[in-house]
Amino acid sequence: MRAQSKDFNDVITQIKEGGNKIGMTTLSKEALQLASMFSFNMSDDIKSLLDGMTVLKITKNKTGTTATFFDNSVKAFDEAGYTSIDVSSYVDRNTVRVFGKRRWLSIREAHIITTTDRGTNISIFGKFKIRTIRRVLKNNDLRKLF
């Protein structure tokens, strides 16, 4: 994020101090509100998958930004027919392809995607747009995470 990098860094600091979780118990109301505005410049297919998920943590390092989603993210990928995520199939540094039963899906701006038993990680190179994760947080009861 260019314009709000200071605010973003403040959020990251609070996340780290709060045990790397975004939630009512670990972030101030202002930081939670700011974090809820982050979204990714991705295809509509992926946005629709992400809309039903709860953001568990956001971390930032030299190579990009990683958002970790709650367990139901894995279920959402399964239901959409994306049975495996091939993190080695870079088209370029801004595109990763998710392999599904039906087709390859290109995810713009994604650097790497991994699924674990704790959730789905999406690492982002560069661009952030302030838009849609607001819906993700609003549609989920964050208290169920704690």
Positions of predicted regions on the chain:
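Short Gly/Thr-rich strand-loop-strand
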Residues: 76-102
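Localized chelating/binding microdomains
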Residues: 35-38, 108, 122-123, 134-136
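A short, solvent-exposed beta-edge/loop patch
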Residues: 99-130
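Early exported N-terminus immediately downstream of N-terminal targeting peptides
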Residues: 7-73
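C-terminal partner/receptor-binding element of secreted or periplasmic proteins
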Residues: 126-146
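Surface-exposed flexible segments
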Residues: 65-80, 124-125, 135-138
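Boundary at the C-terminal end of the N-terminal hydrophobic targeting segment
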Residues: 3-5
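Short connector loops at helix/strand junctions that flank enzyme active sites
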Residues: 50-51, 91-93, 107
